[in-house]
Structure formats: C-alpha cells, structure tokens
Amino acid sequence: MSKKLLIKTWGCQMNEYDSSKMADLLNAANGYELTEIPEEADVLLLNTCSIREKAQEKVFHQLGRWKTLKDKKPGVVIGVGGCVATQEGDSIRDRAPYVDVIFGPQTLHRLPEMIKQSQTSDAPVMDISFPEIEKFDRLPEPRAEGPTAFVSIMEGCSKYCTYCVVPYTRGEEVSRPMDDVLFEIAQLAEQGVREVNLLGQNVNAYRGATHDGGICSFAELLRLVATIDGIDRIRFTTSHPLEFTDDIIAVYEDTPELVSFLHLPVQSGSDRILTMMKRPHTAIEYKSIIRKLRKARPDIQISSDFIVGFPGETDKDFQDTMKLIRDVDFDMSFSFIFSPRPGTPAADYPCDLSEEVKKERLYELQQQINSQAMRYSRLMLGTEQRILVEGPSKKDLMELRGRTENNRVVNFEGSPDLIGQFVDVKIVDVFPNSLRGELLRTEQEMNLRIATSPSEMKAKTRREDELGVATFTP
C-alpha cells in the first residue's frame, strides 16, 4: 500500500509551484501519492504565506487540527514550509513541538532526508537557510498536469519595499541559469503543455547565466521560450515597474506568444505613499510604461496590486490612487488593506486611520475595478477570441472551459478531444465571472508558429559528464 501525502498551500503562485515540486520530489524519492483526506495521510505538509495579517496564528490554528490527527496516529509526520516557516521557525518549534520538519522555500529539496531524519529524532528537524538556488539542481523532472504550467525562473527580491517580507523570507534575487529554464520548459512541452507562466518575485530582474559565461536578460529569455514548438502562450508574474525596461516592451511588438495581459503592481497612485513604501517610481513614470506598452500592443490589458490604508494615507493620497486606476483603466486587481508584517520598516509606522475608513476605501477601489472589468468583458461580446481549452466546464461537465489571453474563462460546447488545444470562439454572452462562446475553428485550421522542437531545445542544453565537464551543443 502506497504512502500518502497531503500538502496544504497558502499564498502566491510561487508557493503553488513549490508545492507541486514537493509532491514530485517525495513521489520520486519515497513513492508518496497525494491525497486530500488528512486522515489518510502519512505526511502532512503546510506551505505557508506571511503576506497577510495574522498569518502566524492561522498556521498555529491549522497545526492544532493536525495535532489531533497525530495524537490518534503517532507515526504521522507534520511539516511546515514556506515564508512563515522562515520567519517564525523558532516560534513554531517552541509553540508546536509536535511538528517534525520545518523548512524554508529554498530548502524544500531536502524534504526526503529531513523527513527520514525526523523519524529517528525527538526534536524537530529544521533548515530555513538560503543556499542560493541549489534547490533547482535537486528536484525531479517536471510533470505536466494539464496544458498549462508554472516555471520558476528566479527566487527572492532585492527591492526591500518597506511593507514586504519577501527579501527576509525568500532571500535576495537569484536567477536560474538560462539553459535550466529552457530545458524544463522543453520537457513540459513534450508532455503537452501549451502555456507557461514564468514565475518570480520580480521576473523582469532576471539575469540568467548562459553556457558561455554570458548573461541572458528577461527579454532574451522570453524570445527563446517563444521559439519552443508547442509553447504558444507565455505569461509571467510578478513584475516591478523599476525594471520594466524598453527591451521587455519591445518583445510585445514581435512575439505573439506573449499574451496581451500584464500584471504590473503599482501599490498606490500617490507619489508620497510610494516614497514611504520605498517604491522608486512615480505614478507618472508608471503611466509612461503603460503608454509604451499600449503602443507596442494596443489591445494589452493591465492588472495591478493595491495596498489601501498604508500608514499616513490621507484622503488625497487615496484619491490619487483612484485617479491612477481610472487613467490606466485597469482590468483587474489584487487589493488589500495594509497589514503590518513583523520585521519590516512599515510595521513601525504610526497609523491613525480607522478600520471603517480603510474598509470604505477598499470597497470603493474594488467597485471601480469591477466596473472597469465588466466593461471590458462587455466589449468582448460578439468578438472572436482564441482560448486554450483547459478541461470540462465547472458549470456543466458536458461542456468545455477555456481561457482567453486576458484571463477570462469561456464556457462552450465542444468535444473532449479539444482539451489541451487552442480553439477560436465567438463570444455570445457575458457574465460577471465568465463568458460564453461558440466554437468557430480548431487548431488544425490555425497557422501556429513552429520554430524549435522540444527535443532540439533539450539537445542544445548544457550537459555535464560524470567528471563534471560541461558541454553545450549550439
């Protein structure tokens, strides 16, 4: 009987990616199979996020529930990973001594040996260090789970925004070598992946080493990924306005695989608040980037992050944010009330705003974004859209579900063999959270670009023999 693994994931797409790698790693090393039933699990892993308020208490609340399972089944291994583990490792060890393994985002590759070690140790096994980007060298080959996939291209952030814990929990920016990224994507393409989402806390700061000792920029990486046959759609998240340079914008002019949708967090429309956040750009500079993007790709749609109620935010500061939202005409946003994160400079800033005012501002902001998003959706009525078919519709299992470039879900009637392919549909109805389409043509009738086969890309990748001597086929 196979051993069972349950992974509970909170937080960003990087955490989702890390959790998938944990599952692959433990399956390859020890034969663990995933389960969603806690009572079945031999190993319970909690992959945590420390961005939001009360993240630590949320962790201890979940661990308390798992302790009940461990009391009934003493052999169960409980592990805590992610950013809360990095920040609060000692606290977890003290407050929850029944936790067996504590690991950080950069040490998840050590999970098999840490779990094994914990089974012969009375004390929790903990490693929350930052060993550069070693974890990517220790992970098994990627396994595709559908036509879309996340691929991490870098880790950490070196910007040190005053409200953010990422530099303290994931370390500073470290880029994966270019060959490693391309090899992973080629492996996924061979398994039927059609869309990749390149991940990092600040992907446009990517500077990956090349086989000949050079450096590959993010713009160059995007163009290389686009040449891999089968990869017909590229997304990336998240970006920083400071390094959204003209060479990246130029990729939107000549690389159709790069989607007409961009998540570019601005956080506030007030220059005063941006300075307090240590965001080294102004609202006007942000709008200048958007103007250049829309010149390169007129149909591009923009989403952002916003923090409402930052310490010292006045009504004028908030109205400056609302003006930026209207001027840029954002399509969607992730918006939150400021919550102080322990150890960050902003946690010590005085704040005299009432919770009521913060909630009112958040509601006003979200209503504005929602109205803009609905207007964009209505403008799509009657248009032709190319969608990647992801699987059965969640509303009707007899129908299919796909996604447009601008992240709209489209439900339509079609045969199951279309799953994993691109189709063109006509949008015939608009709903708050989805669109309805009618099938116009399938992939066989399209002229999708073919450049480099996945096997060719893999053959070009840097290799080391048993002596560690590297070779590269140009």
From Swiss-Prot:
[4Fe-4S] cluster 1 binds at C12, C49, C83. Gene3D superfamilies: Methylthiotransferase, N-terminal domain, tm_1862 like domain. Keywords: 4Fe-4S, Cytoplasm, Iron, Iron-sulfur, Metal-binding, S-adenosyl-L-methionine, Transferase, tRNA processing. Residues 3-120 form the MTTase N-terminal domain. Residues 378-441 form the TRAM domain. Its cofactor is [4Fe-4S] cluster. PANTHER family: CDK5 REGULATORY SUBUNIT-ASSOCIATED PROTEIN 1, MITOCHONDRIAL TRNA METHYLTHIOTRANSFERASE CDK5RAP1. This is tRNA-2-methylthio-N(6)-dimethylallyladenosine synthase. The lineage of its organism: Bacteria, Pseudomonadati, Pseudomonadota, Gammaproteobacteria, Vibrionales.
